[in-house]
Amino acid sequence: MLPPASPFLPASPFIMSFAAPSYAFATPFQTPAASPIRSLMSYAMRPGSISMAGGYPAQELFDIDGLTTASNQVLARLGACLQYSNIDGQASLRAELARLTAERGLACDPDTELAVTGGSQQALALVSRVMLQPGDHAFIESPAFPNSVQALRYTGATVHPVASGPQGIDVDALDEMAARLKPKIVCVVASFSNPCGATISRQRRLRLLELAVKHRFLIVEDDPYGELRFSGEQVPPIAALAEGEARHWAVYISTMSKTMAPALRIGWLVAPAEVRRRCVGAKAADDMASSAWIQEVVAQYLANGRYQQHVPRIRAAYGARCDALAQALHKYLDGRVAFRKPEGGMFFWVRLNGEADATRLLPYAIEQGIVYVPGKAFYADPQQADLNAMRMSFATMNEGLITQGIERLARALDACEANAPVSVSLAA
């Protein structure tokens, strides 16, 4: 039975329609940034699927006991940790991070050169914001992590990719481009880059510093993976190699996301005092401060010595998984793919031989139950994309699953090369 008609409304129902508003979005946000990596997560989460797509650390390797102990210690003695934090970070954590950074070869003043951030992504965004504006130019190695490219683009600056290979960024190309375009920032992941797994040699890092002084640009080194070295010689951060005037042109960024846990959202930057001071001001406008409680927990964890015990354990686990992926590629795809085994980090950059296209192969791979990220997702300029390439992460799977995943990929490649029907349809 219908309710009685309201005396305040007309007897005949009607529908009001409104045109969608036309918002005056800022130029960098007028076209929402698509994430080809996130778009693959629904396939990666299918039951029975083996995902090499994500850049996540292995959840089973998180040191829950160590973090629980540190958290209980902090809450028992420090109720103030539930208050607001200093904008630049808790003094206890800045001191611990300065010690950790010094162990990596880079000495810094925790009060004037180091600041705590919400992961390394916020650190890059802050440096970009205080250095760049519309009309400026920024360089980034190519291929590169898409979110890093977005952090630069959201400032309104023009972002230029600089070719990168197995030894990292092409310094000769950088020199020529910098002479023409006068960049204010050059961004690199110098150790075990995402997506290529490449490491820049000491000699090339020194050359980067020479070019920074010559062209007066700021080197921003993002170092999420440096602790995860399985083989080869450790290379100091770029800023640690800087001498004289070069010390004014290098910023170091790092994070606890890959070694402790990403949910902590603890990163930090080490920068010349004037750059650091402005980044802290930008952070105040951004989020006021990072969580004091989480900062104190991480500081306590470091002070307890658990970090020094934990990193070798995850390094060994990831090293074994890296070996397993290399062996599986040799066993099941020998002669059909090319790759360089990384000395650390989480990623392989695998190239299909011949005319194979990693994007065309992907639906066949998903159908077989294996997911990766096509290489074109990592190019700031799609016209430069290597269509044969794919990024594969070995971090979140044990050796058995890695082997099974590559066996599936071989079957997918067989089907793709035979132009077999495929049930999976991906959006363009």
Q: Which positions does each model-derived feature cover?
A:
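Conserved core segment of the aminotransferase class I/II
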Residues: 243-316, 418
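PLP-dependent enzyme catalytic core of the Aspartate aminotransferase-like
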Residues: 17, 367, 383-428
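N-terminal small-domain helix-loop-helix segment of the aminotransferase-like
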Residues: 28-119, 126, 303-304, 371, ...
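Conserved C-terminal alpha-helix-loop-beta "cap" of PLP-dependent enzymes
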Residues: 276, 280, 350-391, 399, ...
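Conserved core of the PLP fold type I
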Residues: 80-216, 226-245, 318, 400, ...
